[in-house]
Protein backbone atom coordinates (compact mmCIF):
# COMPACT_ATOMS: atom_id res chain seq x y z
CA UNK A 1 0.00 0.00 0.00
CA UNK A 2 1.83 3.02 -1.21
CA UNK A 3 0.89 6.58 -0.78
CA UNK A 4 -0.72 8.38 -3.66
CA UNK A 5 1.17 11.35 -4.97
CA UNK A 6 -0.55 14.70 -4.93
CA UNK A 7 -1.05 16.29 -8.31
CA UNK A 8 0.13 19.66 -7.08
CA UNK A 9 3.85 20.07 -6.65
CA UNK A 10 5.61 22.77 -4.73
CA UNK A 11 8.25 25.01 -6.19
CA UNK A 12 10.81 23.40 -3.90
CA UNK A 13 10.05 19.89 -5.28
CA UNK A 14 10.11 20.90 -8.93
CA UNK A 15 13.29 22.94 -8.73
CA UNK A 16 15.35 20.48 -6.66
CA UNK A 17 14.96 16.95 -8.09
CA UNK A 18 18.63 16.03 -7.54
CA UNK A 19 18.63 16.66 -3.76
CA UNK A 20 17.04 13.75 -1.80
CA UNK A 21 15.48 16.18 0.67
CA UNK A 22 14.04 18.38 -2.05
CA UNK A 23 15.89 21.48 -0.87
CA UNK A 24 18.45 23.43 -2.80
CA UNK A 25 21.14 25.44 -1.10
CA UNK A 26 19.41 28.68 -2.10
CA UNK A 27 16.18 27.63 -0.35
CA UNK A 28 17.80 26.23 2.81
CA UNK A 29 17.34 29.45 4.74
CA UNK A 30 13.62 29.59 3.96
CA UNK A 31 13.10 25.96 4.98
CA UNK A 32 14.93 26.41 8.28
CA UNK A 33 12.78 29.40 9.19
CA UNK A 34 9.70 27.40 8.22
CA UNK A 35 10.76 24.74 10.72
CA UNK A 36 10.84 27.48 13.34
CA UNK A 37 7.15 28.15 12.71
CA UNK A 38 7.80 31.06 10.40
CA UNK A 39 9.59 33.17 12.99
CA UNK A 40 12.74 34.81 11.81
CA UNK A 41 15.24 36.31 14.21
CA UNK A 42 17.87 38.54 12.69
CA UNK A 43 17.63 37.51 9.04
CA UNK A 44 19.62 39.81 6.84
CA UNK A 45 17.14 39.73 3.96
CA UNK A 46 14.30 40.97 6.12
CA UNK A 47 11.91 38.21 5.02
CA UNK A 48 10.71 34.92 6.48
CA UNK A 49 9.02 31.93 4.97
CA UNK A 50 5.47 31.21 6.05
CA UNK A 51 3.63 28.51 4.15
CA UNK A 52 4.73 29.72 0.73
CA UNK A 53 3.94 33.40 1.30
CA UNK A 54 6.82 35.80 1.69
CA UNK A 55 6.16 38.57 4.20
CA UNK A 56 8.29 41.48 5.17
CA UNK A 57 9.87 41.13 8.60
CA UNK A 58 9.58 44.32 10.63
CA UNK A 59 12.40 43.50 13.07
CA UNK A 60 10.12 42.65 16.01
CA UNK A 61 10.68 39.15 17.41
CA UNK A 62 8.13 36.88 19.02
CA UNK A 63 9.13 37.89 22.54
CA UNK A 64 8.82 41.58 21.73
CA UNK A 65 5.45 40.99 20.04
CA UNK A 66 4.17 39.18 23.13
CA UNK A 67 5.33 42.03 25.39
CA UNK A 68 3.67 44.61 23.15
CA UNK A 69 0.42 42.61 23.12
CA UNK A 70 0.48 42.25 26.93
CA UNK A 71 1.06 46.00 27.37
CA UNK A 72 -1.82 46.80 25.00
CA UNK A 73 -4.03 44.34 26.89
CA UNK A 74 -3.13 45.94 30.22
CA UNK A 75 -3.78 49.43 28.86
CA UNK A 76 -7.12 48.19 27.56
CA UNK A 77 -7.99 46.79 31.01
CA UNK A 78 -6.94 50.00 32.73
CA UNK A 79 -8.96 52.16 30.34
CA UNK A 80 -12.12 50.25 31.26
CA UNK A 81 -11.94 51.78 34.72
CA UNK A 82 -11.44 49.07 37.29
CA UNK A 83 -9.35 49.03 40.45
CA UNK A 84 -9.53 45.77 42.36
CA UNK A 85 -8.21 45.43 45.90
CA UNK A 86 -8.16 42.42 48.19
CA UNK A 87 -10.55 42.30 51.14
CA UNK A 88 -9.83 39.93 54.02
CA UNK A 89 -12.10 39.39 56.99
CA UNK A 90 -10.82 38.14 60.32
CA UNK A 91 -11.97 34.56 60.82
CA UNK A 92 -12.73 33.98 57.13
CA UNK A 93 -10.02 31.89 55.42
CA UNK A 94 -10.68 33.09 51.87
CA UNK A 95 -10.40 36.73 50.86
CA UNK A 96 -12.29 38.47 48.09
CA UNK A 97 -11.61 41.26 45.63
CA UNK A 98 -13.69 44.36 45.11
CA UNK A 99 -13.62 46.94 42.32
CA UNK A 100 -13.39 50.30 44.07
CA UNK A 101 -13.93 52.35 40.90
CA UNK A 102 -17.37 50.80 40.46
CA UNK A 103 -18.42 52.30 43.81
CA UNK A 104 -19.59 55.86 44.48
CA UNK A 105 -18.02 56.43 47.87
CA UNK A 106 -17.71 55.02 51.36
CA UNK A 107 -21.43 54.28 51.74
CA UNK A 108 -21.39 52.05 48.63
CA UNK A 109 -18.23 50.34 49.86
CA UNK A 110 -19.69 49.56 53.29
CA UNK A 111 -23.01 48.40 51.83
CA UNK A 112 -21.24 46.09 49.38
CA UNK A 113 -18.97 44.62 52.06
CA UNK A 114 -21.90 44.20 54.49
CA UNK A 115 -23.67 42.14 51.85
CA UNK A 116 -20.54 40.30 50.67
CA UNK A 117 -19.48 39.12 54.14
CA UNK A 118 -22.91 39.16 55.82
CA UNK A 119 -21.58 41.30 58.66
CA UNK A 120 -22.16 44.66 60.30
CA UNK A 121 -19.15 46.77 59.32
CA UNK A 122 -18.18 50.06 60.95
CA UNK A 123 -16.05 52.82 59.50
CA UNK A 124 -14.89 56.26 60.67
CA UNK A 125 -18.34 57.86 60.31
CA UNK A 126 -20.02 55.18 62.47
CA UNK A 127 -17.21 54.64 64.97
CA UNK A 128 -19.40 55.36 68.00
CA UNK A 129 -22.08 52.80 67.00
CA UNK A 130 -20.06 49.79 68.16
CA UNK A 131 -21.95 46.60 69.07
CA UNK A 132 -20.86 43.08 70.03
CA UNK A 133 -21.14 41.67 66.52
CA UNK A 134 -19.76 44.60 64.58
CA UNK A 135 -16.54 44.71 62.60
CA UNK A 136 -14.18 47.57 61.76
CA UNK A 137 -12.96 48.29 58.23
CA UNK A 138 -9.31 49.33 57.87
CA UNK A 139 -7.00 49.66 54.89
CA UNK A 140 -3.29 49.43 54.15
CA UNK A 141 -1.92 52.48 52.36
CA UNK A 142 1.08 52.78 50.03
CA UNK A 143 3.53 52.78 52.94
CA UNK A 144 1.92 49.72 54.54
CA UNK A 145 0.34 51.64 57.43
CA UNK A 146 -3.12 50.49 58.54
CA UNK A 147 -5.68 53.30 58.67
CA UNK A 148 -9.39 53.53 59.47
CA UNK A 149 -11.56 53.69 56.35
CA UNK A 150 -13.31 57.05 56.09
CA UNK A 151 -10.59 59.19 57.68
CA UNK A 152 -9.66 60.82 54.36
CA UNK A 153 -11.73 61.97 51.36
CA UNK A 154 -12.78 59.20 48.92
CA UNK A 155 -10.44 60.33 46.10
CA UNK A 156 -7.44 60.38 48.43
CA UNK A 157 -8.45 56.95 49.72
CA UNK A 158 -8.54 55.58 46.16
CA UNK A 159 -5.06 56.91 45.45
CA UNK A 160 -3.51 55.33 48.55
CA UNK A 161 -5.41 52.09 49.31
CA UNK A 162 -3.65 48.79 48.62
CA UNK A 163 -5.86 46.29 50.52
CA UNK A 164 -8.75 46.18 52.97
CA UNK A 165 -9.15 44.28 56.23
CA UNK A 166 -12.30 43.67 58.26
CA UNK A 167 -11.48 43.04 61.92
CA UNK A 168 -13.65 42.33 64.95
CA UNK A 169 -14.48 45.43 66.96
CA UNK A 170 -13.14 44.92 70.45
CA UNK A 171 -14.72 46.62 73.47
CA UNK A 172 -12.46 47.92 76.23
UniProtKB/Swiss-Prot annotation:
Protein's GO biological process: auxin-activated signaling pathway; gravitropism; response to auxin; root development; somatic embryogenesis
Biased composition (Low complexity): 1-18
Span(s) of short sequence motif EAR-like (transcriptional repression): 35-39
Pfam families on file: AUX_IAA
Domain PB1: 82-171
Induction: By auxin.
SUPFAM superfamilies according to UniProt: CAD & PB1 domains
InterPro entries named among the record's database cross-references: AUX/IAA_dom, AUX_IAA, PB1-like
Annotated Gene Ontology cellular component terms: nucleus
Annotated region described as Disordered, given as residue ranges: 1-28
Main localization, broad class: nucleus
Disulfide feature: none
Keywords: Auxin signaling pathway, Nucleus, Repressor, Transcription, Transcription regulation
Compartments in which it is found: Nucleus
Sample GO molecular function, one term: DNA-binding transcription factor activity
Family assignment from sequence similarity: Belongs to the Aux/IAA family.
Subunit structure: Homodimers and heterodimers.
Domain notes: The N-terminal half of the protein contains two conserved domains I and II. Domain I includes a slightly degenerated ERF-associated amphiphilic repression (EAR) motif which seems to be involved in the activity of transcriptional repression. Domain II is required for the correct degradation of the protein through the SCF-mediated ubiquitin-proteasome pathway. Interactions between Aux/IAA proteins and auxin response factors (ARFs) occur through their C-terminal dimerization domains III and IV.
Name the UniProt record assigns to this protein: Auxin-responsive protein IAA30
Protein encoded by which gene: IAA30
